[in-house]
Amino acid sequence: MSGNKEEEDPRIHGIKTKIRVVPDFPKKGIMFQDITTVLLDPKAFKDTIDLFVERYRDKNISVVAGIEARGFLFGPPIALAIGAKFVPLRKPKKLPGETIFEEYELEYGNDRLEMHIGAVEAGDRALVVDDLIATGGTLCAAINLLERVGAEVVECACVIELPELKGRQRLKGKPLCMLVEYR
C-alpha cells in the first residue's frame, strides 16, 4: 500500500484479483471497476480494511469522512477500528437537518456534497475515504468542505486509482493512499 505505487503485499494482490471490471458501464467506453465483488469475499474485504487501519491507527485521525455511496462501505469499519467518528458526505438533499455543502463540476453539469453542520469541527484531523479516484473532483470537493469548517485533511484513501485521469493532481497537495492502480 502506498501513496504512489502498489507494493508487493500479498493482501493487495488478493484484493486486486477480486475487483471485477465491467465493460461499457455505466456507458459505452467505460471500464467500470466494481468493488462489490471485494465485499463478497470476506478475506479480501477484511484485508482491505486491515491495510487502511494499519496505516491510520497511529495518525490521530479524529474523523473519517466517507463519500457517498461506496465510501460508506469502507469508511465506517476503518473509523471504528481507529477510534474515530464517521461522517457521511452525501449527495444533495439526503441528510435531514442543517447541512453545509460544496459544489463540484462533473463531465456534464455540477453536483455537490453535503454534511451536517457541526459533524466536523475546527481542529479535527480528517481522513477522506472513497472506493476509487478517477478525475479527483469528488475528493477535491470533500477536502474543500472539510477545510471550510476548519478540519485538517490528513490524507485521502481509495481502494482503486485510475492514474491516467490525473485525479491525484486535483487534491490540493493532499496525500493519496490507494491499494490498487489500474492503467
From Swiss-Prot:
Pathway: Purine metabolism; AMP biosynthesis via salvage pathway; AMP from adenine: step 1/1. The gene is APT3. Disruption phenotype: No visible phenotype under normal growth conditions. Coiled coil: none annotated. It comes from Arabidopsis thaliana (Mouse-ear cress). InterPro entries: Ade_phspho_trans, Adenine_PRTase, PRibTrfase_dom, PRTase-like. Belongs to the purine/pyrimidine phosphoribosyltransferase family. It comes from the Eukaryota. HAMAP family: Aden_phosphoribosyltr. It catalyses: AMP + diphosphate = 5-phospho-alpha-D-ribose 1-diphosphate + adenine. This is Adenine phosphoribosyltransferase 3. PANTHER family: ADENINE PHOSPHORIBOSYLTRANSFERASE (PTHR11776), PHOSPHORIBOSYLTRANSFERASE DOMAIN-CONTAINING PROTEIN (PTHR11776:SF7). Keywords: Cytoplasm, Glycosyltransferase, Purine salvage, Transferase. One of its GO terms (cellular component) is cytosol.
